[in-house]
């Protein structure tokens, strides 16, 4: 099995029998793939395809209203509940927290899908603000909320806010400012679960 699906250009969850037929939206790193497409000694056309597919997947896998991402997804972006996992991987839980970082980084470094990236980050950041920055896990439509909003989420969402920081829309700029300020104000985590 290959690490990337050669037909669609997306990275697989794991290149083995159980994990090659789906992916994880947080694995989508179009900015890195774009760099490889420009600098690789071989297979540049594949890396270009992979960058485009990865960028598209960060839009397709986000919920159309909340902007929330599933932890795992099918190649078409639909949420995927992997039967081998110890929890429901079709919801916003652990891996999904990283998706705003990937969107913000790609927006800043590449600027190839700015309009859609702004739209998806506005939905996501508005959703968390409307939740009062209380919860950390959700069904994708936001109907079931549990767990706590974490320092890691504050950091990831602040990176996603880069997409709104220079917007012509004052409301977008203010939302970005609020997320950056929230990150600045967060106390450094300590203890066993400080990574999250």
Each model region followed by its residue ranges:
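Charged low-complexity "KEKE/polyampholyte" interaction tracts
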Residues: 172-187
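Hydrophobic, glycine-enriched assembly/anchoring segments
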Residues: 187-196
């Amino acid at each position: 099995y290959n690490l990337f699906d050669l037909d669609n250009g997306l990275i697989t969850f794991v290149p083995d029998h159980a994990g090659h037929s789906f992916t994880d939206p947080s694995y989508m790193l179009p900015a890195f793939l774009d760099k490889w497409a420009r600098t690789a000694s071989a297979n540049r056309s594949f890396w270009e395809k992979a960058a485009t597919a990865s960028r598209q997947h960060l839009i397709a896998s986000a919920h159309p209203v909340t902007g929330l991402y599933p932890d795992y997804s099918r190649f078409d972006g639909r949420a995927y509940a992997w039967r081998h996992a110890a929890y429901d991987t079709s919801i916003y839980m652990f891996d999904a927290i990283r998706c705003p970082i990937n969107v913000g980084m790609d927006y800043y470094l590449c600027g190839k899908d700015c309009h859609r990236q702004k739209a998806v980050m506005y939905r996501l950041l508005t959703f968390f603000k409307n939740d009062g920055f209380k919860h950390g896990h959700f069904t994708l439509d936001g109907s079931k909320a549990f767990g706590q909003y974490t320092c890691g989420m504050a950091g990831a969402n602040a990176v996603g806010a880069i997409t709104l920081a220079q917007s012509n829309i004052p409301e977008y700029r203010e939302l970005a400012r609020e997320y950056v300020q929230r990150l600045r104000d967060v106390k450094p985590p300590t203890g066993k679960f400080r990574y999250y």
